[in-house]
Amino acid sequence: MARSKRIFLIVALAMTCAGFAGWIYQLMRGLVITDMSNMFNWGFYIAAFAFLVGVAAGGMIISSCIYLFDVEKLKPFGKIASLSAFACACGAGAMVLVDLGSIQNILNIFIHPNFSSPLVWDVIVISCYIVLTFLSVYFQLLPDCKKDGLWFFNGGIRNQSLEEVEKKSHTWSKRIGLVALPFAIGIHTVTALIFATQNSHEWWHTAILPPDFIAMAVASGGSLVLILAIVLSGRELFNERLGGYRIICRIIAVAIAVHLFFTAMELILAAWAGSVETQSLLGVLFGDYGVLYAIELILPTVAMVTFFSKKWTASKGQMVFGSVIVLMATLVHRLMLLYPAFKNATVSFDVLGANGMADWLYPVSTGRVIEMGFPFASTYAYMPTVAEYLVSLLPFGLVLLILAFMNLKYPLVRR
């Protein structure tokens, strides 16, 4: 067991170092190493950022509810839920720095913040969220540190009995949960508003987007918690904790059902409107990116059916498989926020042609004349480069590094 933990730590460290090297290369060359342009200025970085924020929010929502509603069957997973939220929040913060592209931009957001920008508020909320999730992990680990004589900023409990430490841990975990729950909802609401406040993008400009983000956050965050809980608990505790696993499965399934309901409402209204904009949007969704959109819809549906089934949730493999495809679908969902919104120029005019009035997309500057060979375009097909994937290893590697280190040093699951 200790050997596998060390291997996990080494792999996570290697990912982080590779991502850091890629980031240094990006700082030297600029965002030109990506496939982003003036038209498609939010790429894989922003999609991954929204993904990590969602997983972080979902993990903390579950952790907070465990203590606020005193769910006994889920209490063994409280530390895992809080730690996954902390790790993903740190990864999301790193992804913001990566997307800013240069040291000057990073410094400007702290030295000269523009408070009318949702991104500034997202940075503020994420920073507070990192502190809250760390405190949640800290207080939940205190009893274990007291029992095993481990150090985790716990000098203040040396002269306290184990009973006093356990009482303190439970009290403060509940207090933090009371604050962290609205923060978890707030962090993803602000992230959703970054998209929803862009009036020129038909695909984003909807009041449904923030609650839909929350639903997917609960589904993806719950999926990561479920994977970690099953893997760290091992076979010997599976039957004992099956009731807790099934509760998480139902939470994930309900969240997916809510997401699919919101998606259906958006598609029905778009089809009903029948405007040029909505018809163009549906054409992009089911035509140009039909395969990706099918993955986004089919994978969570399969997971939802799996998690609602008592028979299938009796299998460790089925639950892990369902959780993995939920995480995959969530990342695809974040990517599909961008592709339909940025593929075509948002400026258009009605022009008179041979067949009557037609909608003409006004070409805009690409900013990539050397690479593309032409300065203006009305459509842009974005594809993340190898360099983007390499740089993205930094935030994702950081998430795994935190999880691996804490798993090696501290008892996340009491056997």
PLM ranges: what are they?
Residues Q318-M328:
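Central hydrophobic cores of alpha-helical transmembrane segments
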Residues A50-A57, W121-F134, A217, G290-T301, ...:
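Hydrophobic alpha-helical transmembrane segments
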